[in-house]
């Protein structure tokens, strides 16, 4: 039996570019996910937890954890470069509603509801390792939502056009969500194939920002959050191509994702199903000069159909990047990368966010 206690990232499943099972376990830096080619393991942040791993036999492991801390995903601050909402992220204060009947713009404050408990988040896993190198995993998780939902709070005294507007917008995080999952990892020739399937019977699929009219009383009531069944599948591959005429080695990584819900599309936040894929290819050049290795890094992502916020899928949106990375003596690392976003017309909030980034790292 091995154990560790403290702030840590616990990552189960096999997701690469699209959050799956591991996304329920960890809160994340959502702004970092806006950089094309970023893997989910690069955006997760550590949470306080006790983790245990028991080797039952050489081929069977049981894992379990209990989190004693809850933290929400860090979204881009309102008005910052990557922000696409005035109600979510640090600095969110109010939302403005236009009342055309009266020619007015009415502000409503955005307020925080009660945060989920630091307790009540846990998971158990059963892993089976075959002699051939194939691995299977089964998972059961209980977690609190890391992304907020919003509901409108009605003014019971208001009449006329103002009655349908909220007096405040309440930020809410759903508690006690359940996940059931399975994963596999295997080799087919020289290609590593991985995949996972997850099912959440009580995922947040709809939120009502505006108060809702009760036909029996004729009054507007607070908006509601509705749960639904959500199923998600991820399938990925990893392949290292050895010496070629164009590079000393080429690392290929790809993943496709599909997600669906049983709710009617007209009633939910996202589409009733969505799918897309992401690819990266790194061309590596060793010792181009004394102590210096170079890598040309490329990425491409395409939301083929449907939108799903937590998977950063926007219907028909595309993004890609081209970069150069230099490593000196395995300690210094410098990157320059150009990123471009296009497609999806008016619903793609990143269309005007093309950028060039330069980073320098030192390891010791």
Residue ranges and their predicted role:
Residues 15-22, 75-81, 107, 149-155, ...:
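Outer-membrane beta-barrel translocator domains and adjoining extracellular loop/strand segments
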Residues 34-38, 80, 103, 108-112, ...:
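Extracellular loop and loop/strand-boundary signature of outer-membrane beta-barrel proteins
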Residues 1-4, 12-16, 59-62, 75, ...:
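Short loop/turn motifs that connect adjacent beta-strands in outer-membrane beta-barrel proteins
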Residues 7-11, 66-72, 140-146, 188-190, ...:
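Transmembrane beta-strands of outer-membrane beta-barrel pores
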Residues 352-364:
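Outer-membrane beta-barrel "beta-signal"
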Residues 1-88, 305, 315-317, 339-343:
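Outer membrane beta-barrel
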Residues 3-5, 52, 64, 126, ...:
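Membrane-embedded beta-strand positions of outer-membrane beta-barrel proteins
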């Amino acid at each position: 039996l091995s154990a560790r206690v403290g702030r840590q990232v616990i990552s189960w499943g096999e997701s690469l570019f699209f959050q799956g099972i591991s996304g329920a376990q960890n809160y994340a830096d959502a702004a970092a996910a806006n950089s094309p080619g970023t893997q989910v393991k690069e955006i997760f942040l550590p949470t306080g937890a006790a983790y245990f791993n028991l080797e039952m036999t050489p081929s069977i492991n049981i894992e379990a954890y209990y989190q004693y801390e809850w933290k929400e995903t860090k979204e881009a601050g309102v008005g910052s470069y990557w922000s696409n909402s005035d109600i979510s992220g640090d600095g969110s204060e109010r939302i403005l509603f236009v009342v055309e009947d009266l020619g007015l713009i009415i502000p409503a404050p955005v307020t925080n509801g009660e945060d989920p408990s630091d307790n009540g988040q846990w998971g158990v896993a059963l892993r089976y390792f075959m002699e051939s190198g194939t691995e299977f995993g089964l998972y059961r998780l209980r977690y609190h939502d890391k992304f907020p939902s919003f509901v409108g709070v009605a003014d019971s005294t208001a009449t006329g056009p103002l009655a349908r507007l909220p007096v405040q917008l309440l930020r809410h995080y759903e508690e006690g969500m359940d996940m059931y999952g399975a994963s596999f990892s295997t080799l087919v020739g020289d290609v590593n194939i991985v995949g996972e399937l997850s099912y959440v019977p009580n995922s947040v699929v709809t939120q009502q920002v505006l108060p809702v009219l009760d036909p029996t009383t004729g009054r507007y009531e607070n908006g509601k959050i509705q749960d639904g069944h959500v199923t998600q599948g991820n399938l990925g591959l990893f392949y290292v191509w050895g010496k070629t005429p164009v590079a000393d080695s080429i690392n290929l990584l790809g993943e496709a994702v599909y997600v669906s819900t049983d709710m009617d599309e007209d009633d939910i936040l996202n589409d009733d199903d969505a799918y897309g894929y992401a690819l990266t290819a790194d061309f590596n050049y060793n010792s181009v000069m004394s102590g210096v290795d170079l890598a040309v890094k490329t990425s491409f992502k395409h939301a083929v159909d449907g939108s799903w916020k937590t998977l950063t899928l926007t219907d028909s949106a595309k993004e890609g990047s081209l970069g150069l990375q230099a490593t000196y003596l395995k300690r210094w690392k410098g990157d320059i990368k150009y990123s471009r976003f296009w497609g999806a017309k008016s619903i793609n909030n990143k269309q005007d966010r093309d950028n060039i980034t330069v980073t320098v790292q030192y390891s010791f």
